[in-house]
């Protein structure tokens, strides 16, 4: 008895294994570098915005250079764009594990970036108003001070929601994908899946006034997420995806072969 093998993808030309592995390495490297960019670009921002955030009215009505605030704004733009980049670059891989999680990851990154950029616009408006306030007097000066203070508070709230709430959500999506696929050591996504609820809880506590946005509890609860994102960036940059994880993905997505007896 002979057999006839029908393969669903028989007409599809598959890339050579070496070419496929090179493509996966490129994706991992790009995703890892972008993650490291978001991490590095976000570190100086707390210091650069300190003068404005600690004393909004004093900053608006005071004199001096805006250089630190402008650099901080530029780094926030870099952080926002690199954040979107991580989700877009990794999409060809993440969608193979869960299309819903992959789309959710991209969506949450876009929302996060949008919130960050709204904050940047607010900061740049404060810089402009600060220059206008130099020659203002009376009611106009008071109006500029109040508006400037409100814009600083807007920046703080968008920053809280962007780098707190949305960061927790997008790390839940990525943590789930990485844990399920074993593309990186499982301890890395476990840290992310633990850290995401913690930063969501911290963001909620800050919104309801339990503690300040810049405080010991807020910093402590953000550490696991910071460790997760840094570890993802380093691992993907240095090591790439684990071969065993890629092999499992290939096996899961391989076309099903049906063997039927010939008549």
Where are the regions a protein language model picked out?
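Hydrophobic, aromatic-enriched alpha-helical segments typical of multi-pass transmembrane helices
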Residues: 2-263
């Amino acid at each position: 008895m002979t057999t006839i093998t029908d393969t669903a993808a028989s007409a599809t030309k598959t890339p050579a294994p070496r070419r496929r592995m090179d493509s996966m390495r490129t994706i991992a490297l790009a995703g890892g570098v972008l993650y490291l960019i978001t991490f590095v670009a976000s570190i100086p921002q707390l210091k650069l915005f300190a003068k404005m955030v600690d004393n909004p009215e004093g900053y608006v009505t005071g004199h001096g250079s805006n250089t630190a605030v402008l650099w901080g704004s530029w780094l926030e733009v870099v952080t926002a764009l690199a954040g979107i980049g991580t989700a877009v670059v990794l999409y060809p891989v993440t969608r193979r594990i869960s299309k819903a999680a992959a789309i959710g990851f991209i969506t949450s990154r876009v929302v996060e970036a949008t919130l960050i950029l709204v904050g940047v616009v607010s900061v740049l408006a404060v810089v402009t108003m600060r220059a206008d306030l130099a020659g203002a007097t009376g009611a106009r000066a008071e109006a500029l001070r109040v508006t400037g203070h409100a814009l600083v508070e807007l920046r703080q709230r968008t920053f809280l929601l962007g780098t707190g709430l949305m960061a927790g959500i997008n790390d839940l999506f990525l943590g789930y994908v990485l844990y399920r696929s074993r593309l990186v050591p499982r301890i890395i996504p476990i840290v992310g899946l633990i850290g995401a609820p913690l930063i969501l809880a911290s963001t909620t506590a800050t919104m309801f006034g339990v503690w300040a946005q810049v405080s010991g509890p807020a910093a402590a609860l953000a550490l696991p997420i910071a460790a997760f994102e840094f570890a993802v960036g380093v691992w993907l940059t240095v090591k790439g995806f684990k071969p065993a994880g890629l092999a499992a993905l290939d096996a899961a997505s391989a076309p099903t072969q049906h063997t039927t007896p010939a008549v």
